[in-house]
Swiss-Prot record:
Disulphide connectivity of cysteines: 33-84, 37-58, 44-65, 48-67
Primary localization: secreted
Name of the featured protein: Neurotoxin LmNaTx1
GO biological process terms on file: defense response
Length: 86
């Protein structure tokens, strides 16, 4: 029973320490912009896993990669802190 409780707590903690969102470029001319795509899920999945995420896909309507399970240390795009093109 104790092992089950520890397992549930561990899963909860892992869930709290990850986030989902649009990863952004951290350098170059596109700094602060979402990583763009058209229909290439493999590309986005690779970019997301390289950043420590669990998976990723191309969100077609936004033309940008969307990552799931990113570490909190990875910057993601937010409307409030949008610096793309500035």
């Amino acid at each position: 029973m104790k092992i089950l409780i520890i397992f549930v707590i561990a899963i909860t903690v892992v869930g709290v320490q990850s986030k989902d969102g649009y990863p952004i470029y951290s350098t170059g001319k596109s700094k602060g912009c979402k990583i763009e795509c058209v229909i290439n899920n493999k590309y986005c999945d690779k970019e997301c896993t390289l950043k420590g995420g669990s998976s990723g896909y191309c969100y077609f309507w936004k033309l940008a990669c969307y990552c799931e399970g990113l570490p909190d240390s990875v910057a993601v795009w937010t409307y409030a802190e949008n610096t793309c093109g500035r």
